[in-house]
Amino acid sequence: MDIRTTTTTATDWAGDLLALGFFEDQVELSGSLAELDQKLDGILQELIAETEFKGKAGKSAIARISSKSPIRKIMILGLGKAEDFKLDTLRRTAATIARSAKKEKGKTLGISLPLWNNDPTSTTQAIAEGIELALHQDHRFKSNSEDNNDNHAPEQIQLLGLGDQTTAIERAQRICSGVILARELVAAPANVVTPVTLAETARDLAQEYGLDVEVLGQAECEALGMGAFLGVALASDLPPQFIHLTYRPSGTPRRKLAIIGKGLTFDSGGLNLKTGGSGIETMKMDMAGSAATLGAAKVVGQLKPDVEVHFIVAATENMISGRAMHPGDILTASNGKTIEVNNTDAEGRLTLADALVFAEKLGVDALVDLATLTGACIVALGDDIAGLWSSDDALAEQILQAADHSGEKLWRMPMEEKYFEGMKSQIADMKNTGPRAGGSITAALFLKQFVKETPWAHLDVAGPVWADKENGYNNAGATGYGVRTLVNWVLGS
């Protein structure tokens, strides 16, 4: 698939499918559009009239044109109200166009959409992202090659009237490569993606993009006192892997950042075993935070900003065996704090505790962790929105802006300190869970105990890392949520 920009406008373009975007209640044909309609013998105006097209968001229609026309089919799409026009409108519209072109088996596709904020570069990048992400298909585990219909995707896609935007397209493709890596890591089952697989992925990224990588095994983690992380790993037959991947710019870094991703490649719940109806069969995706972390590393390694970034994953499984940690066990984290385990199914925060301590010791300017941490966050915000907790208002605002620019939905949640009272233990410094109410808040407060002074933010991404059905440029399945927000944050820091 070849995506290019061109100075050619819709009036002069020729190919299989021409897609045009219209704002709501702005569908009158004048100027170049009237000229195009005349060239098409009135088909465009006829399509608008027959479908009662008003330009409302999500509405579209397609018409076939006579064989004598240089354009085989034309598609009109509603963009919604002009005042609500965002970059994500372009992504979602481009996704609809790309899927329609694939369905119509059009090999050449022309797209004419309005500029966002009079910015052809951002407009191009958003359209290219929508196309790349919508057309990504994961067929690794299909035995029937007929299930793979990628050969129907358009071969040539031209973004009309945008001039030369080669750099913006390359940037979009690099960003999408990280999202796709994250999607495919999350989508793969736990017998394919293991802690060792994540470590191998990190090594591959290091080799391909010139990053530094260190993978600590159990003995090295024991030497660093990572009792919380290793407590979770006790029952698994697979070795724990503590992954530290580092991007260093060629010159003096402007800032130093750390991104920490939860890396539970399977979560059985431990001795507090997840039962039928608990979603245990979906727990391959409990490493989505680490997938986003590695996906962001892939992008940063290609874009090469002047910021040093550390990517950290404490990877393991949470399993059951005679070696498993028990409810009631006391673990000692690497900062010396003790934790009474009152629920072995609240294990992600235990692995993150040692990862946060490790990251802060690197002397970074800010820490951000991502984790599929709580079902409570899904109850609060639904499937599409991640929660954000932060000890630092400036950092929180940076991440919110990065998410808004990427189109990944994120909502800041309260850090209600008094709720931590419910996590205090009579025999240890804290318990790993609190009362039922406010579960996503108490989880964030638990993590806060393992960060001293460094500005820190926690993203609970349990909802949006997976889509049960197609939604915008996300196909059903793993979404790669978080990669684009992280990349935008790094680039804007």
Swiss-Prot record:
Question: What top-level class of enzyme does the UniProt entry assign?
Answer: hydrolase
SUPFAM superfamilies assigned? Macro domain-like (SSF52949), Zn-dependent exopeptidases (SSF53187)
Q: Where does this protein reside within or beyond the cell?
A: Cytoplasm
- Which Gene3D superfamilies does the entry mention? Leucine Aminopeptidase, subunit E, domain 1, Zn peptidases
Q: Which residues form the active site?
A: K274, R349
Print the keywords alphabetically: Aminopeptidase, Cytoplasm, Hydrolase, Manganese, Metal-binding, Protease
The protein's Enzyme Commission number:
3.4.11.1, 3.4.11.10
- UniProt-listed CDD domains: Peptidase_M17
Q: What biological processes does GO assign it?
A: proteolysis
- Grouped into one coarse class, the protein's main location is cytoplasm
The note on the cofactor says: Binds 2 manganese ions per subunit.
The record's GO CC annotations read: cytoplasm
Binding site residues for Mn(2+) 2: K262, D267, D286, E347
Q: Which GO terms describe its molecular function?
A: manganese ion binding; metalloaminopeptidase activity
Indicate yes or no for the key word Manganese.
yes
User: What function does this protein fulfil?
Assistant: Presumably involved in the processing and regular turnover of intracellular proteins. Catalyzes the removal of unsubstituted N-terminal amino acids from various peptides.
Note the HAMAP family from the entry: Cytosol_peptidase_M17 (MF_00181)
Q: Which family does it belong to?
A: Belongs to the peptidase M17 family.
Q: Which PANTHER family match?
A: CYTOSOL AMINOPEPTIDASE, LEUCINE AMINOPEPTIDASE-RELATED
- What is the designated name of this protein? Probable cytosol aminopeptidase
Species name for this entry? Cyanothece sp. (strain PCC 7425 / ATCC 29141)
Quote the gene name from the UniProt entry: pepA
